[in-house]
A protein has these predicted regions:
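Short catalytic/signature loops enriched in Gly
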Residues: 4, 80, 149-160, 173-183, ...
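Conserved ABC transporter NBD signature motif
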Residues: 65-81, 417-425
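ABC ATPase NBD coupling module
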Residues: 77-100, 126, 277-281, 368-372, ...
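Conserved ABC ATPase "signature" region
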Residues: 136-181, 476-494, 603
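Conserved ABC ATPase signature
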Residues: 159, 186-190, 499-503, 507
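Conserved catalytic motifs of ABC-family nucleotide-binding domains
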Residues: 207, 520
């Protein structure tokens, strides 16, 4: 196996649910050279995560590794071992020790009952015969290595800057107290990026030769994602550690991996050096994955899909992209002046939604429950959304995007400011007027599975708003409306009696879009509505949203932390930071000539293939 840390040969994983038979991984072969990173890419259901679980020995019933060999060589001076020939007890000695894994959602991987110090020291003592105090020392060292805790030297400098009269023993006491306080924090007290660093610290605590990272940055915004990717890359270089990096984001792979392997329906269809595969792909599926990504350097009327390439139509559909926005240089707005459109703007229409000096705050209460002050999630913003346009809303987690969306939908009451919809002041609407407004404003959420009732068939889910608002004369007409909507979003009227769990993630999001359209709204907020989808399904949903907008004259606010997606779908972009508007302008202008350092930071943090390889086509 040369100097490979792992050598996978003819690996086959099958599932036997009830009387069915599914081949999830179909005889794949790959190696990961020592000290290098292999990016494993493909759509949801392609077999990526099952491959990782097979390496870790975690494929559970009804799954089974039915063929193949997995040769693992933690050190170059030790002979390779076929992991599939080891007993469960022997496999446990490698799992978490010489081979470790971090998952997509750290909150579900960490036990909420125990503090992070306990969980890291437990992992250390599971694989090393060390005392509790030594395990604690190692846990602190790992947290410093992943940059959650400052180094001892920095902690010492901070203590002396705060009070230079402290004695050496007092300084040491303060340093130890800071370390202890961090170890005693619980998962719910940390942000998503901090939690992922805790998972990385736990994974590297026993010096693994191979780290498997399964979608570790998918749930993070671009700036936090960039920090985590840089950290993983630095750790691999410093430790000589190999990594299997699983993702559906090809830009992330381009910035992280040395080699890439592409999976499709359980098969490995293409593999090689990262530059070679991404600049000259050979397999139609790889070409499709690359083409269906929204790109910052292109303005397309719609995105190609993977199926275009698998059917041989991709080259025609991607040629000569149509501009969706002709930038006239007019439309750049400051955060202080809401002069959104001039007479020469390329998209002139009447305002649908106008927001004036909006403030939304959450009370921070004192010891007796009285509000002492307010945390301002949205702090004095003003903007206008025009009929038929898409306003992209971007910013880091916690900047106020979702709070703003809920306020516009009248789910949260503002402290100050006014909201006008179709020329009417809706700020304080209640009762019948608010009920009437609900028909005109809808939302599509990020997670389609959690926003659909698992006990209701999709037909009942979509017909529910029609019943509530007493639309159409009878149940037959309502069912016809549901059937039409399902057909319009790319499903079948025959799916009406099926349940959410019977659909894929992309299909469930189409169901949510159909439900949002049921009442013929004028205005829809898409709150991270494609963030949970892989790149090929994302392209299909984005194309669908644009088609529906043209057909029904819809107006969107599209919220996302993926700036390349926002650029593709939006006419204008509004950047939020700490509850305020950084800048607003046409999508083209914002990305070509951002006016604020914060916007430039967001754009620079986007992982793209084009940045890595200077691709011009």
């Amino acid at each position: 196996m040369g100097d490979a840390v792992i050598d996978v040969r003819n690996l086959k994983v099958e599932f036997f649910p009830e009387d069915q038979h599914l081949i999830a991984v179909n005889g794949i072969n790959f190696q990961i050279p020592r000290g290098q990173t292999l990016g494993l890419v493909g759509e949801s259901g392609s077999g990526k995560s099952v491959t990782a679980l097979a390496l870790m020995g975690l494929v559970g019933t009804p799954g089974e590794v039915t063929a193949g060999e997995i040769y693992f060589q933690p050190a170059s001076d030790t002979p390779p071992i076929d992991l599939l020939k080891l007993s469960n007890a022997q496999r446990r000695n490698y799992r978490g020790g010489k081979m470790a894994m971090i998952f997509q959602e750290p909150m579900s991987s960490l036990n909420p009952v125990y503090n992070i110090g306990f969980q890291i020291t437990e992992a250390i003592r599971q694989h090393q015969k060390v005392s509790p105090s030594e395990a604690r020392r190692q846990a602190i060292a790992r947290l410093q290595e992943v940059r959650l805790l400052p180094s001892d030297d920095i902690l010492r400098q901070d203590c002396l800057l705060e009070d230079n009269s402290l004695s050496e023993s007092e300084v040491n006491h303060r340093i130890n107290e800071q370390k202890r306080a961090f170890l005693e924090r619980y998962p719910h007290q940390l942000s998503g990026g901090q939690l992922q660093r805790v998972m990385i610290a736990m994974a590297i605590s026993c010096n693994p030769a191979l780290l498997i990272a399964d979608e570790p940055t998918t749930a993070l915004d671009v700036t936090v994602q960039k920090t985590i990717l840089n950290l993983l890359r630095d750790l691999c270089q410093a430790r000589g550690m190999s990594m299997l990096f699983i993702t559906h984001d090809l830009g992330v792979v381009a910035e992280t991996a040395d080699q890439v392997a592409v999976m499709y329906q359980g098969n490995l269809v293409e593999s090689g050096r990262i530059h070679s595969i991404f600049t000259d792909p050979q397999h139609p599926y790889t070409k499709g994955l690359l083409a269906c990504r929204p790109r910052l350097d292109q303005t397309l009327a719609y995105l190609p899909t993977v199926s275009d390439f698998l059917t041989g139509d991709g080259q025609v559909k991607t040629a000569n992209p149509t501009l969706q926005w002709q930038d006239t240089g007019i439309g750049r707005e400051s955060a202080d002046h809401d002069n959104m459109r001039g007479e020469d703007s390329s998209l002139v229409s009447a305002p649908l939604l106008t927001v004036q000096n909006l403030q939304v705050g959450f009370p921070l209460r004192g010891i007796f429950g009285q509000p002492k002050r307010y945390f301002m999630a949205v702090n004095g913003i003003s903007f206008t959304v025009y009929r038929g346009e898409t306003l992209g809303l971007v910013g880091e987690s916690g900047c106020g995007k979702s709070t703003l969306a809920r306020t516009l939908l009248k789910l949260i009451s503002p402290l100050h400011g006014q909201i006008f919809f179709s020329g009417e002041n809706i700020t304080h609407w209640q009762g019948k007027r608010l009920r009437r407004l609900r028909r005109q404003m809808q939302i599509v959420f990020q997670n389609p599975y959690s926003s659909l009732n698992p006990r209701l068939s999709i037909g009942k889910t979509i017909i529910e708003p029609l019943n509530i608002h007493q639309q159409y004369q009878n149940s037959r007409q309502r069912k016809e409306r549901v059937g039409y909507l399902l057909e319009r979003v790319g499903l079948s009227a025959n799916d009406m009696n099926r349940y959410p769990h019977e659909f894929s993630g992309g299909q469930r999001q189409r169901i949510c879009i159909a439900r949002a359209l049921a009442l013929n709204p004028q205005f829809i907020i898409c709150d991270e509505s494609v963030s949970a989808l892989d790149v090929s399904v994302q392209a299909q949903v984005l194309n669908l949203l644009k088609e529906l907008q043209d057909e029904f004259n819809l107006t969107y606010i599209f919220i996302s932390h993926d700036l390349s997606v926002v650029k593709f779908i939006s006419d204008r972009v509004m950047v939020m930071n700490k509850g305020k508007i950084e800048e607003i302008g046409s999508a083209q202008t914002i990305y070509k000539t951002p006016q604020t350092a914060y916007t430039r930071k967001l754009i620079d943090a986007i992982p793209t293939i084009e940045k890595q390889f200077k691709m011009s086509h």
